[in-house]
Amino acid sequence: MDAPIKAPTALNTEKARALAVALAQIEKQFGKGTIMKLGAGEVIEDIQVVSTGSLGLDIALGVGGLPRGRVVEIYGPESSGKTTLTLQVIAEMQKIGGTCAFVDAEHALDIQYAQKLGVNLQELLISQPDTGEQALEIVDSLTRSGAVDLIVIDSVAALTPKAELEGEMGDSLPGLQARLMSQALRKLTATIKKANCMVIFINQIRMKIGVMFGSPETTTGGNALKFYASVRLDIRRIGSIKKGDEVIGNETRVKVVKNKVASPFKMAEFDILYGEGISRLGEVLDLGVANHVVEKAGAWYAYRGEKIGQGRDNSREFLKENPALAIEIENKVREALGIPLVQAAQGSAEPEKAAKPEKVEKADKPVKAVVDKTLAAPLAPVAS
């Protein structure tokens, strides 16, 4: 049986007065808004997010993308797609008018590849610092300006402390990088939140020696980043995509290892095509089949009873030639999953009027549809 609710007593009144005095003193010393009741004042806004460029990963993150004003860590083995994923995030941020910076500590950014992924090089800020301290000071200055929306650091392993650079080869300097990262993150976290700036750290994997139980894998830079990161993504290459004997891309799996804004431990799989980046249309097909928006019978894919292609590659090419139809299918998938819809590009037809495959009586040839020139506009960015 629940205990009866007690009426306010003199003791409770005294506690309320003492609390009011303490709050007034704190606001006088540190400024208005330093402390307040969570239900008072302004309405708490929903988490602002930026798409990753992958529909499946946006869904796995639970909020439709990566959160702004937070620290994010993306780690994985070599050539697993870490830099590609961050460049896609930069492209998505630029589509909604955000200012982005890339701190290239590895001195290995391929600007031609970045451009192919949709990055606007004219608007991208880039820095190639000499030391780890210099790199993190640059990040601190950019976040304090309040004018930058996204900063990518590639990578934590390349943030070499100045003392290590000035020392001799073979010098033992334990813990220098870990202390550097710990100090920097203590300093940066509050500023990142106030500036609503997302900071993405790319990290590498190392093997711990003598581990008998559990995974021997660990990330560089100590434990501070593990604690301060709101989202941690583990990205792995799980296979190759071939066209004949030629390898044209990687099958990639991303696991949400840590997530402070939604449920963790979800996974997403997508294709990364060389020279193109994440195959969004391939994801639309796969998620369409999984959510019963697209029908699949044998090798044939169909939408609303109309065949759109034989085989995944042919169907993906058909959607590439018919962007309005691709938007329509993607919105059906988004509607089924309960996430915000994507808007059609200006100058394109409405999704309901999108070009549809012609009906065929015989299924011996791929369907060819006549597409109006006005439907050739690219897919619109995902609304964050």
UniProtKB/Swiss-Prot annotation:
It is found in: Cytoplasm. One of its GO terms (biological process) is SOS response. One of its GO terms (molecular function) is damaged DNA binding. The keyword DNA-binding applies. GO terms for cellular component: cytosol. It comes from the Bacteria. ATP binds at residues 76-83. SUPFAM superfamilies: P-loop containing nucleoside triphosphate hydrolases, RecA protein, C-terminal domain. Belongs to the RecA family. HAMAP family: RecA. This is Protein RecA. The lineage of its organism: Bacteria, Pseudomonadati, Pseudomonadota, Betaproteobacteria, Burkholderiales. The gene is recA.
